[in-house]
Each structure stands twice: as C-alpha cells, then as structure tokens.
Amino acid sequence: MQTAEIRRRWLDFFERKEHTVVPSASLVSSDPSLMFTVAGMVPFIPYLTAQVPAPYKRATSVQKCLRTLDIDEVGKTTRHGTFFQMNGNFSFGDYFKREAVAFAWELLTTPEADGGLGFDPERLWTTVYLDDDEAFQLWREVGMPAERIQRRGKADNYWNTGQPGPGGPCSEIYFDRGPAYGAEGGPEADEDRYIEIWNLVFMQYQLSAVRTKVDFDVEGELPAKNIDTGMGLERVAFLKQGVDNMYEIDEVRPVLDKAAELSGRRYGAVHEDDVRMRVVADHVRSALMLIGDGVTPGNEGAGYVLRRLVRRAVRAMRLLGVEEPALPHLLPASMEVMSASYPQLRSDFERISAVAYAEEDAFRRTLVSGTAIFETAVAQTKAAGGSSLSGERAFALHDTYGFPIDLTLEMAAEAGVGVDEPGFRALMAEQVGRAKADAKAKKTGGVDLAIYRSTLEQLPAPVVFTGYEAAAGEARISVVLQGGVSTPSAPAGTDVEVVLDRTPFYAEGGGQLADHGTVTTTSGAVLAVSDVQQPVRGLYVHKGTVTSGELVAGDAVHAVVDAGRRRSISRAHTATHLVHQVVREHLGDTATQAGSQNAPGRMRFDYRSTAQVAGDVVRDIEAVVNERIHDDLEVSAAVMDRESALNSGAMALFGEKYGEKVRVVSIGEDWSKELCGGTHTLTSQQVGLVSIVSESSIGSGARRIEALVGADAFDFLTREHLLVNQLTEVVKARPEELPDRIGALLTRLGDAEKEIARLRGGQVLALAPTIAAKPVDKFGVRVVTHDAGPVSADDLRTLVLDVRSRLGEERPSVVAVAGVAKDRPVVVVATNAEARRWGVKAGELVRTAAKTLGGGGGGKDDLAQGGGQDPSKVPAALQGIEDFVGARVTGSV
C-alpha cells in the first residue's frame, strides 16, 4: 500500500467519523518555544490546553514534522530520520477513551478491500498505563486478548507537558513483525520486533507541581476531556510495504536509488555506503519540504538547520565518489513522489530547486578549499602526537573557509581525532559576542512564556482586538505584571506589562511594528505604551511606564493609540503589499515574500530569488509601485474561511500560522490579495510615495528591498535633489553628466594614487643597500631588521628578497622587514639556506612576530609573511625576531 494511499484512507476514515480534516500546518512552528513542528499535536496545542476555544469538536490531520535532535544518528540506524508525517485524530471535549479505542481498532483491522489498513488482529499488541483499568477493559471489549495487553508505568504510558496543565495516561498499539526480528514477549521484551504504530493519549487530568516526567501531582479531573493520537505514517508505510525501514518506502527509496545510480554503488553491499545513501535520502526529502515551507539557508535558526541538511547530503554524495552537483538529480526524484500528497511542491519547484542548487554550489566550493586545509590540520596534529584539533584550528576552518563546527566535528570523528570544542566556542564568543536571544524572548524581556500562558488561563476570555475599527476605546485592566509577576497595582515611575480585556493597540506581528500610545484610568493614572506583544495567542501585553498616578488591576481605562504612528505604519504595510505584487509581476510568481518589516515611514521586504536584480529592473519596480499608488486603488479587508480565501487567489505566506478563519486584504479588488492581519490605508493613494533606497542579497536564495514611504520618501528625494544640485556646482556639470564626470575624476585619482605608491615603493627599495649594510650578529647568524613605515606588502617582499641576495649565502642570514599597509602592520621574513641549516626558519619567526602584533601568519621556511592589528607594536615585533634567532641558535627554544 502506497504512503499516499495510507494517508488518504486515514483522512477518509475520520472524515466519515465526523472529524474536520485540517490541512498540515507549516514545518516552521508558530509556537515561539519551538523552532519546528515536532509532533502532530503541535498545531492543536492552544485547543488541547484550553488557551483558546477549538473551532471544531473533532479534527484529523496528517502533519508534516521535523526533528533534528538525533541528526548524527540518521543513516546509522533504521529508526532515525529528520522529516516525518504524523497522522492524528483529536477530540476537544467530545468523545473520549471508548471511541478512541474503537476507532483505532476499526481502522487498523478493517480489510484493505473494505477501506481499512488491513493489519492482522492476531499480530497487534497494546500497552496501557499501570492503573488504567478502563483502557484495559475497552481493549478487551474490541477483541484484544488480555495476554496481548501490557501495563506500563509513567515513563512509558503517561503524558504531560512538563509543566502544570492537562495530562493523562496513554495507550500504545504495536505490530508484531515476527520471530525473525527478535524475542517473544510483547513490547516489554523487544521493541525491534514489536513496532509501535499508534499512540492514544487520554487527556483527563489537571496536573500540578510537575517536577519531572514521572513525578507530578494530580489536582483532579478536567471538566472537558480531550483525545490526542499520533500514528507515524512512514512507520505504517514500511510495515504495509513489506520493507524493513522507512528509508525503503515509496516516498524515500527513489532518492536512495538515485544516489546509488549516481555513485555506481549498490545499496546493501557496504555498510558505510548504505549509511551515506540513507543520509542522502533522508536529508534531501527534509530539505525539499523545508524549502517548500519557505525556509531558506542561513546561519541561524531554521535556516541553519536547512543549510546543515543540504551540506550533509552533499558531503555524503562526495564520500560516495560523486564530484559533480548531485541535487539536480536527487531533488526532482523526491519531488515526484512527495508531490502526490503535496501538489504545491510541483508548482513551486522552480523556486525550491533554485534555492537548493545555489546552496549546493556554494558548499561545493567550500568543501574543495576547506577539506584540504582540514586534512592538513589533521595530519599536522597527528604528526605532533596530538589527538585533538585545537580550538584555533576549528575556528579558522569556520571563519576562513565556512566550515560549520558540526561538519568539523563530524569529519574529525571520521579521521579519528577530537576537537577542542570549548576552545572553539570561546573564540566564537569573542568574535560575535553574546548570541542573539530568540526574538520572542527578547520582546518579552526574557520572561518565561509559562507566565503568559498562566495569565491567559486566568482570563474569562481571550483579549478582544478592536483596532481595525477604531484607534481608541474603553477597556478594563485585567492584569498588571511587574518583572513577570502579577501585582495588584503599580505606582508612577514603574515599568509594567498590562493586559486589558479589549484593546485598540496592534501587537507586533506579521512584520508590522506595534502601536504606541496611552492608557488612562478614570482616576487619572497614565501608562505610556511603548510596545505591544502577543507572546501567546489571545493575550495582548502592553509594555510601558506608569507616568502618573497608580495603575490598579480592575480599573476602567481609556486606551488611545498614537494615530500618527499608526497611519505611518499602515502606509508602510500597504506599500509592502504593493511592492510584493509588482516584484512578482517583474520577476515571476516564485519571487514570493520571505519576510518584512513595516515601521513608521519605512518598509523592508524580503523575497525569494537566486538571481541578481538589475538596477533598471529595480527602478521599473519603483515606478510601477508609484503608478499603482496614484491609481487610487481601493484597499479592503474581509474575513472568510481559509479554504475559500486560498481558492480566491489570496497569497498565504510560508511559515505563517493561519486559523480556520482568515483576514484577506485586497488592493484594487483582485490585483493584490494576501492573507494579512495588519493595518492598512483605505486607498493606495494614501500611501503617498515609495522610494526604494536599496536592493541587495541577504543570503543564498533571498534578497531584500528597503524603501521609504510617504513623507519620509518625500524628504529623502528632497535631500537627494539638493545633493545633486551641490554636486553639479562642485564638478561644473549638468545633472545628467555627473556619472561620467565623477567617474573620470575617480579614474584620475586612482592613477595618481598608483603613481604615489610607485614612487614610495622606489624609495623603499632604494634603501636595500643601506639596510643590508647593518646586520646584527646573533651567535653567528646575521640578522637584519628594518621598520619601513607606510608601504605595500608587495614592496616589503621585494625589499626583503633584495636584501637577502645582497647578504649572500656564505654565512647564515635572516632578513625581517615590517611596515604598515592599509593601516595594519605587516612583517615579511626571509632566510638563506645556511640559516635554515642552523635551524632558523622564516615561518617560525613570522609567527613569533605576528603574535606580538596581535595577528597571525605563516609561510615556508625560506620566506613567510604575517600581520596583525597594532602598528605600534612593530618595533617590539622586530626585536622579538632578533631575540628568537639568538634563542634558536643557542638551543634555549
């Protein structure tokens, strides 16, 4: 049975059981505590934990999931994978254990010919929680023999969130693969033979004081009990397809086979090759799905995970002997099978493939240069008797050659050496400072999100947003937080977070910055609002300072948004929609939005594109945007169900979380239509003007447009006009002649600088006879040092070689000349053959000097070069070379 068929049967079965079929959410989780959607229940957490009312009583889905915790084990075992799909059925206060057990048994054991999954009932086992007699009896009633029902403890069969909230026992269903796979005795005896295929979680208790997974207090029964189940689609697929693991199912095997074909290796012949092919098969599919959900390669967050997946796959192919680009062969193979369930992969494949291929090309260049450096470092480490690469080596690989530390660790393990990871981390910390905190955590001041979830649970209803209709309104203070702790009141001068029962303030989201304004109580206390966040869905947190009076929880207030700021941000947001549409018209439908920021008077629009955009195209985009502004198109918003919105042509942004009801913002009826929760102008003409100030690449497959909007754009153009007028007066040219005139001036300036450098170099080289005439004797070695002052590195090398030749080969000689090139100190050292015979090497001397200069360097025994940061240390560096020569000759170093 094909994987897509299992998926279809699952959804059809539960739809017949009156479940709402919910499309898969994005792999990029909307939960700020998660990077990815790691389980089928993640999109339903707000409903399962009663943060917000569920829009349906019953739901079913096949959810895309990604886990990378055990990425290093992928391919080495047949259990580990990164991307997987989780079938789930959910009940929100509707049916409970009896129906959940009955549904599971019916779907599993109904013959394939009758629409079921056709598992042999005699090969099914279940586990229940130790004290869950009810679940035990329900399994007996559907026909499961008592001897195939095993009771297990909290560690295996009790679910909780890790914090106070809902929890309850669970029941797991296993399939017996037979004696060839292990010992008899059920799941407790051997989980290689008895494979878990379905987990039923019975959320029936309110837990308190959760200390660990197995140590918690049960406060009582939940008023409304929920069901959350999960079935691994790939796991069921390999059982139904008669193969041994997920790598061999129909949705994964084609990539594995293509890797074997490209490499000329046979899967199943050599264990190391099998591991690499499985890595390729898994990671290519994961990369396909991540890029499909809008992720682009980057150096942090989800982008870094994607980059790592692509690079691990590319490197695995190189280890299989494939030197040419492999993704153009592998990615289409994955798309062909995955598009049966996710048809958008086919329609979006031009964009997806462009992003993936660009990342492979970039990494292949990195591998070519970096691998040689890595192998040299390993050889030198082993030759010196070491067992671990230094932190400095690992850092150099990362900083200079683009090797991520995980790749260095992986390659080092394969080469049989360790890595000084703490040393690497320390150097990284020095370079980049403290790592950026998660954006949500920064916005909430580092306060634990559990505090906000608890605050929301205490409210009688989620906060109502009224800001679409009005920029002011009456409300009441529900909660006052100070330092993450609820307080009954807050005096003047206090920084607080305030929750109102309703608010006109827009919380930062969807690329739009938060509203500012004031909240005034009937007694005259005033909160100056400087930020508004929605840390958990349904909770608006107003951050600010009490400027007068005392805020008291429960007080009636008048909330007023800064209307000027709101209008300016709204103009920027509408401008972003205009730019998005025009970019797609000029660059194609694959140039979709990847991010944005809408601030007062300015906008930033990130979009997906692998090609550089010509300047005249950017100017055309700006011109068309302003044409649409002056067309005075109507801007309207309507709320509708998600499916209708998408069918109407509205664009949904990858990675965004949408509910069943969505807000659609349209410009000019059907000209631009996007799912959007932000605020906008009433017409395009109210935007005023858009002036694009930059268009640039921000990474592989992504570009950015930055623009000024409205009055800020007018001010910018006014300043530009004044600047042009000033330039025309200075260079005595008309505006249209400025580029040629300034270009000619720059050419003349460059020629003059070259001539000055030539003359200065001649002066430096003319010093060679004088410098060579003043050697210092260091225990029989002639040492010449000289500080040349401002000079080019090329002239330094020429001078050093000239002086060395003048000293001859009869006696051991060392020449060291330093200078300052482009504001940085440079040192060049040369030795003759006799000096090298005495053990004096140029590379060793340069490293000594460079350390004094605060830098590094190296080279050959006869000629080496280094540099640093501090020009004032040049005399000390040269003296250090003299001293080191003496120490080397006398044997003290």
UniProtKB/Swiss-Prot annotation:
<dbReference type="Pfam" id="PF07973">
    <property type="entry name" value="tRNA_SAD"/>
</dbReference>
<dbReference type="InterPro" id="IPR003156">
    <property type="entry name" value="DHHA1_dom"/>
</dbReference>
<dbReference type="InterPro" id="IPR045864">
    <property type="entry name" value="aa-tRNA-synth_II/BPL/LPL"/>
</dbReference>
<keyword id="KW-0030">Aminoacyl-tRNA synthetase</keyword>
<keyword id="KW-0862">Zinc</keyword>
<comment type="function">
    <text>Catalyzes the attachment of alanine to tRNA(Ala) in a two-step reaction: alanine is first activated by ATP to form Ala-AMP and then transferred to the acceptor end of tRNA(Ala). Also edits incorrectly charged Ser-tRNA(Ala) and Gly-tRNA(Ala) via its editing domain.</text>
</comment>
<keyword id="KW-0648">Protein biosynthesis</keyword>
<dbReference type="GO" id="GO:0002161">
    <property type="term" value="F:aminoacyl-tRNA deacylase activity"/>
</dbReference>
<keyword id="KW-0547">Nucleotide-binding</keyword>
<keyword id="KW-0694">RNA-binding</keyword>
<dbReference type="GO" id="GO:0005524">
    <property type="term" value="F:ATP binding"/>
</dbReference>
<keyword id="KW-0963">Cytoplasm</keyword>
<keyword id="KW-0479">Metal-binding</keyword>
<dbReference type="InterPro" id="IPR018162">
    <property type="entry name" value="Ala-tRNA-ligase_IIc_anticod-bd"/>
</dbReference>
<dbReference type="GO" id="GO:0008270">
    <property type="term" value="F:zinc ion binding"/>
</dbReference>
<dbReference type="InterPro" id="IPR050058">
    <property type="entry name" value="Ala-tRNA_ligase"/>
</dbReference>
<feature type="binding site">
    <location>
        <position position="680"/>
    </location>
    <ligand>
        <name>Zn(2+)</name>
    </ligand>
</feature>
<dbReference type="GO" id="GO:0004813">
    <property type="term" value="F:alanine-tRNA ligase activity"/>
</dbReference>
<keyword id="KW-0067">ATP-binding</keyword>
<protein>
    <recommendedName>
        <fullName>Alanine--tRNA ligase</fullName>
        <ecNumber>6.1.1.7</ecNumber>
    </recommendedName>
</protein>
<keyword id="KW-0436">Ligase</keyword>
<dbReference type="InterPro" id="IPR012947">
    <property type="entry name" value="tRNA_SAD"/>
</dbReference>
<comment type="similarity">
    <text>Belongs to the class-II aminoacyl-tRNA synthetase family.</text>
</comment>
<feature type="region of interest" description="Disordered">
    <location>
        <begin position="853"/>
        <end position="872"/>
    </location>
</feature>
<dbReference type="InterPro" id="IPR023033">
    <property type="entry name" value="Ala_tRNA_ligase_euk/bac"/>
</dbReference>
<dbReference type="InterPro" id="IPR018165">
    <property type="entry name" value="Ala-tRNA-synth_IIc_core"/>
</dbReference>
<dbReference type="GO" id="GO:0005829">
    <property type="term" value="C:cytosol"/>
</dbReference>
<dbReference type="InterPro" id="IPR018164">
    <property type="entry name" value="Ala-tRNA-synth_IIc_N"/>
</dbReference>
<dbReference type="InterPro" id="IPR018163">
    <property type="entry name" value="Thr/Ala-tRNA-synth_IIc_edit"/>
</dbReference>
<dbReference type="InterPro" id="IPR002318">
    <property type="entry name" value="Ala-tRNA-lgiase_IIc"/>
</dbReference>
<feature type="binding site">
    <location>
        <position position="577"/>
    </location>
    <ligand>
        <name>Zn(2+)</name>
    </ligand>
</feature>
<dbReference type="GO" id="GO:0000049">
    <property type="term" value="F:tRNA binding"/>
</dbReference>
<feature type="binding site">
    <location>
        <position position="573"/>
    </location>
    <ligand>
        <name>Zn(2+)</name>
    </ligand>
</feature>
<dbReference type="Pfam" id="PF02272">
    <property type="entry name" value="DHHA1"/>
</dbReference>
<feature type="binding site">
    <location>
        <position position="676"/>
    </location>
    <ligand>
        <name>Zn(2+)</name>
    </ligand>
</feature>
<dbReference type="Pfam" id="PF01411">
    <property type="entry name" value="tRNA-synt_2c"/>
</dbReference>
<dbReference type="GO" id="GO:0006419">
    <property type="term" value="P:alanyl-tRNA aminoacylation"/>
</dbReference>
<keyword id="KW-0820">tRNA-binding</keyword>
<dbReference type="InterPro" id="IPR009000">
    <property type="entry name" value="Transl_B-barrel_sf"/>
</dbReference>
